[in-house]
Each structure stands twice: as structure tokens, then as C-alpha cells.
A protein has these predicted regions:
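Short, well-structured alpha-helical interface segments that form or flank functional binding sites
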Residues: 46, 50, 54, 83, ...
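Catalytic cores of nucleic-acid endonucleases
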Residues: 108-154
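Nuclease-adjacent, charged terminal/linker segments that flank catalytic cores
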Residues: 1-17
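Short, well-ordered amphipathic alpha-helices
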Residues: 55-60, 88-92, 135
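Glycine-rich, often proline-containing surface loops adjacent to acidic residues and nearby aromatics
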Residues: 28-36, 104-107, 145-149
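Acidic-basic catalytic patches of nuclease active cores, encompassing PD-(D/E)XK
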Residues: 17-76
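Secondary-structure boundary elements
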Residues: 61-65, 95-98, 139-143
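Active-site metal-binding core of divalent-cation-utilizing nuclease and nuclease-like domains
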Residues: 69-104
Length: 154
């Protein structure tokens, strides 16, 4: 009989480092999405959900997923959380699947390129309804790390 605790990767000292580097890879690929959007002729309107949906269109496209080695990931919009909705859920699938609660979150907010104080408006929203939601456990964090996207708008 095999001892299941030996096969549990969570006991491995570098398991958190592996998860963090995996998420770093995902976020680096999101930078490639940004460049693809910039280089496309697609019109981007000043609306958080619309911008997020353009990102998701790339992240859910099979050709893009093959090119950037994202086939083992499922990207979902508007994931219901403890007390709100996070913009993008990244669920590892296939070999990396743990369970439906084991996912990364990406919260998206617009940032104002003109009002840089962050005391009111969009920049305050980024802090209050973005960063603070992660810091206060408003959003779950199975892997201990999540991300914020700031869409700079005029």
C-alpha cells in the first residue's frame, strides 16, 4: 500500500514557489495579450467590462492558448466570490486540476491617467474595490496569490 502523504505535492518544500511561478507565467502571457490588443485594429472603449472581455476573448481562444501554452487553463468572467464578483477566474485544468475552489483571481479596474492622487474617482476605486478586497480576504485566495489589472484610461 502506498502512503498518500508521500504523494501529496503540498508537502514538497517548493510547491508554493512552483504555484507562484506558474501564476507569473500566466500574468506574463497577459502582457502578450495586451500587446496583441494594441497591435490589433480592435476598438477599445472606456468601460472596464468591455476591456476585460477583450482580454478574455484572447485568453479563451484555442489558437492563442496553443501558441502560449495555456491549454490547461480555463478563464472565466465574473466569478462569484464570498461577497462579490471577481473579474477573471483562472482555473488550472487537466494535470494541474485540484478542485473547483483551487483557482487564481484577476481583478480589473480602470485607472485615470489625469487624476493621479488616488483619493477619489477611478484610482480610489482601484485601491478600495480592488487591492483592499484581496487584503481583507473579501476575495478568496486558495494559492495565496492573485492579481490586479489596471487599465489606464483618459
Amino acid at each position: 500500500m502506498i502512503n498518500n502523504s508521500i504523494l501529496n505535492a503540498a508537502c514538497f518544500g517548493y510547491s508554493q514557489t512552483r504555484r507562484d511561478s506558474y501564476f507569473e507565467f500566466i500574468l506574463t502571457t497577459c502582457v502578450d495579450v495586451y500587446y496583441a490588443i494594441i497591435n490589433s485594429s480592435e476598438e477599445v472603449i472606456n468601460n472596464e467590462t468591455s476591456i476585460r472581455d477583450i482580454f478574455l476573448k484572447y485568453l479563451q481562444c484555442l489558437a492563442f492558448k496553443k501558441k502560449y501554452k495555456l491549454r490547461n487553463l480555463k478563464f472565466d468572467p465574473e466569478t462569484l466570490e464570498n461577497r462579490g464578483r471577481a473579474d477573471i477566474r483562472v482555473l488550472p485544468a487537466k494535470d494541474d486540476y485540484i478542485d473547483d475552489e483551487a483557482y487564481y483571481l484577476i481583478e480589473c479596474k480602470r485607472l485615470n491617467s489625469k487624476n493621479l492622487t488616488g483619493e477619489c474617482g477611478l484610482n480610489a476605486e482601484y485601491v478600495i474595490n480592488g487591492i483592499c478586497r484581496f487584503a481583507s480576504n473579501y476575495y478568496s485566495s486558495h494559492f495565496g496569490c492573485n492579481a490586479m489589472f489596471g487599465f489606464v484610461v483618459e
